[in-house]
């Protein structure tokens, strides 16, 4: 049909002759049924976390090949599932399939492997956290966002510096990289409550729609994408519905629709009213 589909990892290895020249021992593990990333869900995240955990003591680092559409969701989820990490878990992929002449897959994968194997002078991993590597940049996994569906600069971390930039050599920003307590064991948390909704505020938003969403009996969390520094329309019904949900034990987190900047609900009156209604700031 000409449509892009997931492929078996063996096909990738057949096209990646450069892998043999790396001074790194690489083992591979392939899921039996490759999955388009648009079909990822929390059960798949938990499975990935368990795969890492089951092999954690056998390897110095992990590279996960993942479709770009939901890669940022997976990297963020894994960053909370894999607690007390002392080894890199790096997600990467490509915009063009590896068989195409201008593919970005080779550089992304080869550099990800090198970063996953990188150690400091004491033999500790340079980047012991969940990350995304793409187009020369290593990003914190729970700060990365897919920003481009066409170019090779697919991901960006708007409110947090790159952990490493890959040029002729690697430039690590050590003071921005998590430093783990190496005495603590890996703590894997795979239980997630999926009764969460994300909705964006917009001028003219209707009470009947918001009321219907917030009235869901199993609702446990709301991510509200608000205006600017965390503001919302000062409609009394919005504040009442949010307050009622908060009183029922629903966690409501306020994030901005802006790509950069921070939620400061105490800055303007509309934001202060959200705070009074029990809404929690998502900061940056």
List the predicted regions and their residue ranges.
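Short beta-strand segments
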Residues: 64-66, 90-93, 131-135, 200, ...
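Short Gly/Thr/Asp-enriched flexible loops that form oxyanion-binding sites at enzyme active sites
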Residues: 64-87, 234-241
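Internal gly/pro-rich beta-alpha loop/helix module
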Residues: 91-168
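Short glycine/serine/threonine-rich phosphate/pyrophosphate-binding segments
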Residues: 1, 69-75, 105-109, 231-234
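ATP/NTP phosphate-donor binding region
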Residues: 1-54
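Structural motif
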Residues: 60-61, 221
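Accessory alpha-helical/coil subdomains and C-terminal extensions
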Residues: 5-20, 140-229, 234-235
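C-terminal non-catalytic interaction/assembly regions of soluble proteins
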Residues: 226-284
């Amino acid at each position: 049909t000409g449509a892009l589909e997931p492929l078996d990892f063996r096909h990738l290895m057949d096209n990646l002759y450069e892998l043999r020249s790396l001074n790194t021992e690489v083992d591979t593990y392939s899921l039996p049924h490759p999955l388009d990333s648009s079909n990822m869900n929390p059960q798949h995240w938990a499975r990935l976390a368990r795969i890492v955990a089951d092999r954690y003591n056998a390897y110095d680092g992990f590279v996960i090949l993942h479709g770009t559409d939901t890669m940022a969701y997976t990297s963020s989820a894994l960053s909370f599932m894999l607690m007390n990490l002392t080894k890199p878990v790096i997600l990467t992929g490509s915009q063009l399939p590896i068989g195409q002449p201008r593919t970005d897959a080779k550089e992304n994968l080869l550099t990800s492997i090198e970063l996953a194997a990188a150690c400091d002078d004491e033999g500790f991993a340079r980047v012991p956290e969940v990350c995304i590597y793409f187009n020369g940049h290593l990003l914190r996994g729970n700060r990365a966002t897919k920003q481009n569906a066409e170019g090779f600069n697919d991901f960006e971390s708007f409110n947090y510096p790159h952990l490493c930039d890959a040029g002729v050599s690697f430039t690590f920003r050590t003071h921005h990289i998590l430093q783990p307590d190496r005495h603590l064991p890996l703590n894997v948390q795979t239980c997630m409550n999926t009764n969460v909704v994300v909705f964006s505020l917009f001028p003219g938003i209707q009470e009947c729609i918001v009321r219907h969403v917030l009235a869901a009996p199993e609702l446990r969390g709301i991510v509200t994408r608000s205006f600017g520094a965390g503001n919302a329309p000062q409609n009394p019904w919005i504040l009442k519905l949010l307050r009622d949900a908060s009183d029922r034990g629903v966690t409501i987190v306020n994030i901005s629709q802006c790509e950069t900047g921070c939620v400061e609900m105490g800055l303007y009156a509309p934001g202060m009213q959200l705070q009074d209604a029990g809404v929690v700031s998502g900061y940056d």
